Regions:
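Active-site helix of classical SDR
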Residues: 191
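NAD(P)H-binding glycine-rich loop region in Rossmannoid oxidoreductase-like domains
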Residues: 73-119
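Conserved small/polar residues in nucleotide/adenosyl-binding loops
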Residues: 197-204
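Glycine/Thr-rich phosphate-binding loops of Rossmann-like dinucleotide-binding domains
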Residues: 13, 79, 104, 149-151
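Conserved Rossmann-fold NAD(P)-dependent oxidoreductase catalytic core, especially the SDR/UDP-sugar
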Residues: 96-98, 125-188
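Conserved catalytic-core motifs of eukaryotic protein kinase domains, centered on the activation segment
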Residues: 39-40, 104-111, 151-155
Length: 207
């Protein structure tokens, strides 16, 4: 099995890459190293040194005997390269972590808000369109966050999936199915509530 991990240099992506590689999957990490660039921008360093991708991949091959491939690509900017990569590398699955993932960073300034929205929404939209354009039958896993529901108690256990609700109308009550209402507390969490990742247009047809 072959898996492409978008955002595979991140704090969730790299452990996922190691886990799946250890289980025998062929792994391709796709990342533009934005987390490292943000650390440089903020002049911060991890308490645990984070090695370069080359060093990480070499160390993993030394201890496991397995290779992890790497491509430097910005998912939300380089659509044609992404389509070509999906066609050529032919993944069975794609795990999508390629998003700016810090709520405080997303609220730091107008520029940081713009970057978070541009990166997070375009990355997901490009990925969905690229999968359709590639014509491949690819399983997609996307990382969510409980923060889309806010940080105050809802007074109940938030249900999964759709809720059946009754709505009063001029013609009497009607039943509908809805998602539990989101209440994002940051620009980052707002991007996670956007439903671009639910499905491409039902009118899209693979060739």
């Amino acid at each position: 099995m072959r898996v492409m991990i978008l955002g595979g240099d991140g704090f969730c992506g790299w452990p996922t890459a190691l886990h799946l590689s250890a289980r025998g999957w062929d792994v391709l990490v796709v990342d533009n190293l934005s987390r490292r660039n943000i650390d440089n921008e903020l002049e911060i360093r991890s308490l645990t040194p984070i090695r370069t991708m080359g060093e990480r991949i070499a160390a993993w091959q030394e201890v496991s005997g397995r290779a992890i491939d790497f491509v430097n690509l910005t998912v939300g900017k380089e659509f044609d390269r992404l389509v070509a990569l999906i066609k050529d590398w032919a993944p069975d699955s794609v795990v999508h972590f390629a998003e700016q993932r810090a709520a405080p960073y997303s609220m730091k300034s107008a520029r940081h808000k713009l970057y978070t929205v541009d990166n997070n929404l375009n990355a997901t939209n490009h990925l969905l369109a690229a999968i359709v354009e590639s014509g491949r039958d690819v399983h997609l896993a996307h990382l969510g966050t409980m923060g889309v529901y806010g940080y105050t108690t809802a007074g109940l256990r938030i249900p999964e999936g759709y809720l059946k609700v009754t709505i009063d109308t001029d013609h009497g009550p009607t039943e509908q199915e809805i998602l539990f209402p989101p209440n994002p507390g940051s620009i980052y969490h707002m991007t996670k509530t956007c439903l671009l990742y639910t499905s491409p247009s039902p009118r899209d047809k693979r060739q």
